[in-house]
């Protein structure tokens, strides 16, 4: 299951991807992978129920609306058609914070578990703390947090994610300042390619900020080992 544009349309495995062979105006075209997984599970359960298979009633798919909305909003896909529906219903579930991991994550993000959450809260508070771990450290940490039902473990992991995000913000600020200085030193060009010994996990963020500031195409290259 994936939502990214595929390089090849011919694959030798079962692929659920609306960007392959589907019409561009299909209502599911903008679903992210979290939304696609939610729809896939919903469809499989429906088929099982219609076939009289008791497994079709073994999972309440609505119990996963919070995770579907979290992925949808944090992935910054357009909040229209089915994405909007997932986000609207999922935000209510997110606000209830029935999962211990989400309660801890909401708390370290400076909000009150059980309160009303908006898409902005997910995009600018919760999402960055989840993504920071994948950018700088171990991407399995937020997964462990969301799967855990131990309050103490969740608080510890959420605090670690918060610390990693603060580190990411500091690195991002440094990289953006250095890359911006390089770009400005080049003068008024049609576009910029800047590079340095920068962490590859934040160069995309820096490029976006410089692009908006200079109103020019920008490529920021970092370094990982011996490779740029």
Question: What label would you give each PLM region?
Answer:
Residues 8-9, 228:
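Short secondary-structure boundary/hinge segments and terminal tails
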Residues 46-228:
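Hydrophobic helix-and-loop "lid/oligomerization" segment in the mid-to-C-terminal part
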């Amino acid at each position: 299951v994936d939502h990214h544009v595929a390089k090849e349309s011919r694959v030798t495995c079962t692929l659920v991807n609306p960007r392959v062979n589907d019409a561009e105006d299909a209502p599911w075209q903008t679903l992210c992978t979290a939304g696609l997984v939610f729809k896939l599970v919903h469809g499989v359960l429906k088929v099982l129920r219609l076939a009289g298979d008791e497994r079709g009633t073994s999972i309440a798919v609505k119990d996963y609306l919070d995770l579907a909305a979290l992925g949808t909003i944090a992935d910054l896909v357009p909040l229209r058609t089915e994405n909007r529906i997932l986000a609207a219903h999922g935000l209510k579930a997110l606000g209830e914070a029935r999962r211990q991991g989400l309660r801890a994550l909401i708390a370290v993000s400076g909000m009150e578990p059980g309160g009303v959450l908006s898409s902005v809260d997910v995009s600018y508070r919760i999402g960055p703390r989840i993504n920071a771990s994948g950018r700088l450290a171990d991407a399995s940490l937020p997964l462990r947090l969301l799967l855990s039902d131990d309050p103490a473990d969740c608080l510890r992991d959420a605090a670690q994610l918060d610390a990693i995000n603060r580190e990411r913000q500091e690195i991002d600020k440094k990289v953006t300042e250095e890359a911006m200085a390089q770009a400005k030193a080049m003068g008024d060009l049609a576009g910029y390619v800047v590079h340095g010994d920068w962490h590859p996990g934040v160069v995309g963020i820096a490029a976006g900020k410089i692009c908006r500031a200079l109103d020019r195409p920008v490529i920021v290259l970092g370094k990982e080992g011996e490779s740029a």
